[in-house]
């Protein structure tokens, strides 16, 4: 899918999820989340072509303009909505599925490593499709959050969360088991 189509999808996703988003033009001109996703697409393309320094510069400019820090190596799905995005941090090896929703202050980070050798490989979370992450939530390490799960505001997730579950608390515990099929 080309970038203009992705941008249109991003804008439409914000309009569907944010009752304060009145028009596509307003979202395009004023949404830090949409802006950060656009910058990330450029940075990620540069990263994949191994223009690492330029990718990091683009990523830094995005953070400066939007307050949202997305590492250029992160993999983001379609129609991600970052609502009130100030302070959102998404690490290098994070993977985010389609149709996810993040509120402000969300961190997809790595755990503290004992040595540099431990920093090689997968260090950040993987989120399935349709995951909602509440304000101030922190998800650390190479954990998996299943499709349709919700991470409550201010929760700290250190273990895998099954699909459809609600994770709540510090450290987060599953409060609602996934629905039986």
Feature map (PLM): residue ranges:
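Ubiquitous "structural anchor" signal
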Residues: 41, 99, 117-118, 177
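Regulatory activation segment
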Residues: 115-124
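Left-handed beta-helix
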Residues: 66, 71-72, 77-78, 83-92, ...
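Solvent-exposed, flexible loop/coil residues
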Residues: 32-33, 38-41, 74, 80, ...
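Residue-level signal for alpha-helical context at structural boundaries
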Residues: 25, 29, 60-61, 94, ...
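Terminal amphipathic alpha-helical/low-complexity segments used for targeting or macromolecular assembly
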Residues: 1-66, 181
């Amino acid at each position: 899918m080309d970038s203009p189509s992705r941008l249109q999808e991003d804008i439409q996703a914000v309009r569907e999820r944010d009752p304060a988003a009145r028009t596509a033009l307003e979202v395009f001109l004023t949404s830090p989340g949409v802006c950060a996703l656009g910058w990330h697409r450029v940075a990620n393309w540069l990263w994949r072509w191994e223009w690492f320094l330029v990718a990091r510069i683009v990523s830094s400019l995005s953070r400066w303009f939007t307050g949202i820090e997305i590492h250029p190596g992160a993999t983001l799905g379609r129609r991600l909505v970052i609502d009130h995005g100030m302070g959102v941090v998404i690490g290098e090896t994070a993977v985010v599925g389609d149709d996810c929703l993040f509120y402000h202050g969300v961190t997809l980070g790595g755990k503290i490593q004992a040595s540099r050798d431990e920093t090689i490989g997968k260090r950040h979370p993987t989120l399935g499709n349709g995951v909602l992450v509440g304000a101030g939530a922190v998800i650390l390490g190479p954990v998996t959050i299943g499709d349709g799960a919700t991470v409550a505001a201010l929760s700290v997730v250190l273990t895998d969360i099954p699909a459809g579950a609600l994770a709540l608390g510090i450290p987060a515990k599953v409060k609602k088991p996934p629905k039986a099929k």
